Amino acid sequence: DEIIMDNEGKQETLGAFTRCNRGEKYVDHHTLFFINADQAGFNHAAFEVTNWDALMSSHYALLKAGHRHSFGVGKHILGSQTFDYWKDPDGFTLEHFTDGDLLNESFGSQKRGLEDLLGTHWGPDGMPGQ
């Protein structure tokens, strides 16, 4: 899926979620997200957990241990993952997620706006990892 934004009346691609094409086999909504930016960088690493209970028990265990919470808990619009973002001791952003969309090649690709990238079905709006 491409993320489109308006730049002085012209639509430009801000980024793209990419997934492994396995034909009719269902795969995660995205494996990588590329963004058109002025400099090279890596935004965050994401780790899938088994279910809602694992996500929330990890959330409270990390809080209790004094780790720095960054963003969440919420549900992304694109990919529909339930998410929770944290900072590691070096300030790097880590995401725990569960229950994301599974798609096959028949789904194709969509163009979506920045509001879908930054928005949530529920939970905080904004940019994770800040």
Regions of interest found by a model, annotated:
Residues 6-10, 37, 75-79:
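A short beta-turn/loop motif at secondary-structure boundaries
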